[in-house]
Amino acid sequence: FMMAIGEFKVVKDTYKKPDGTLMEVNYYVEPEWEGDAKAIFGETPAMIAYFSKLLGVEYPWDKYHQIVVRDYVSGAMENTGAVIFGDYVYKNKRELLDENDQSTIAHELFHHWFGDLVTAESWSNLTLNESFANYSQYLWDEYRYGKDEAAYQAEIVEKNYYESAKAKGYHNLVWFDYETREDMFDAHSYNKGGRILHMLRSYLGDEAFFKGIQLYLTKNQFKAAEFHQLRLAFEEVCGEDLNWFFNQWYLGSAHPILDIKQKINASTNTIEITLEQSQNLELAPIFKLPMHVAIYDSLGKHIYPIVFDKINQSFTFPFNGGVNCVIVDDQQMLL
């Protein structure tokens, strides 16, 4: 429940639903920001349309308002149909050329499916809310600005997880032995969880990934869910046992660290790539890592799928002429 009282100007916008009806999308701002409100929040109707189509579940509420308040300590909050933002979002049109808050706007909107429509059944499962909201930022960047910009922003998200984990320690994504619920609001639940979803998307492919999400949302709407419900939805769609993925990423800690060596055999026109998992095995498991290796030779680029699931493993690939470049995890699947 949220109540906002103040001298707001209400800047009105709309979202056109698939049936042609219009839904209110209003922006509540202080009077001096009335002229900038649509510049700040104006992508919101397009976000609602895109996310509704992508998820296969129409925005499930009857309005979407965004209210800017002062002295708010939590950045923003996904109150159903009435999201609040701190006054940091106030930027004029010139300032918005340098920095906008579309990632936060997308994040809070996505919570209306993940958090509001389907709610994590416990603080331990908070990542079911926050990882999806975090990943929405990638999805919007990918749609609005292209894959390169999305990948660039994803690198920042991933780096923030590494730095946070190094400073504060590692824990499971689904974390049962936290001390206080505030401990759950960290770069594991948000950043790491978002990148794990991207790994799963890369592994399953877009069709199965988004159908799995649609099934998860429709089966669990207006209910509380835990991460096993998410796994079961993906398994039903793809027909594959995904316990290995969820066990290592949701119930396991830390992340893989890979050492890579290569050896070219000119007499057989082959290259041997040796991979080693060098993470601390007291903190992390030996990961099963599906990925792709790209070999660039005189005839162009050749992509080979592999599964690396041992401490040390070698893979041999053919080449033509000479090897110009080798890229392990060519599709940037891995955390």
Region locations from a protein language model:
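Active-site-adjacent bridging/hinge elements
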Residues: 19-24, 82, 106-112, 163-176
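Hydrophobic helix-coil surface modules that form long, contiguous segments used
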Residues: 1-106, 135-138
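Acidic/His/Gly-enriched intrinsically disordered linker/tail segments
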Residues: 98, 130-195, 199, 220-222
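Second-shell loop/turn segments in exported
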Residues: 29-39, 122-123, 183-186, 199, ...
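Short acidic/polar inter-strand loop motif in beta-rich domains
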Residues: 330-335
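Catalytic Zn2+-binding segment of zinc metalloproteases
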Residues: 109-124
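Amphipathic alpha-helical substructures
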Residues: 178-182, 186-273
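Beta-strand-rich binding/interaction modules
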Residues: 242-243, 253-328
